[in-house]
């Protein structure tokens, strides 16, 4: 499985010194939202971010934050 940092490396401030880490975040499914889509007159989809490892959309952003903290030599993160 391609990890989030690897997949979006050209969009993130990732260098060769940035550790590529993952807790299995990302790759959440798109679900068609038929009822709301019909009301809005569009084809509408939503992401199931609750299926990330911690059940939160924050997993995506935190993997980059933790990788950059590790790159900077941080011993801990609060």
Where are these regions (language model features)?
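PLP-dependent amino-acid enzyme catalytic core
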Residues: 1-78
């Amino acid at each position: 499985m391609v990890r989030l940092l690897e997949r979006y490396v050209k969009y993130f401030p990732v260098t060769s010194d940035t550790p590529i880490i993952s807790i299995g975040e990302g790759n959440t499914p798109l679900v068609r939202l038929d009822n709301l889509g019909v009301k809005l007159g569009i084809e509408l989809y939503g992401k199931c971010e609750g299926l990330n490892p911690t059940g939160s959309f924050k997993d995506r952003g935190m993997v980059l934050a933790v990788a950059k903290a590790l790159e900077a030599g941080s011993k801990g993160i609060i």
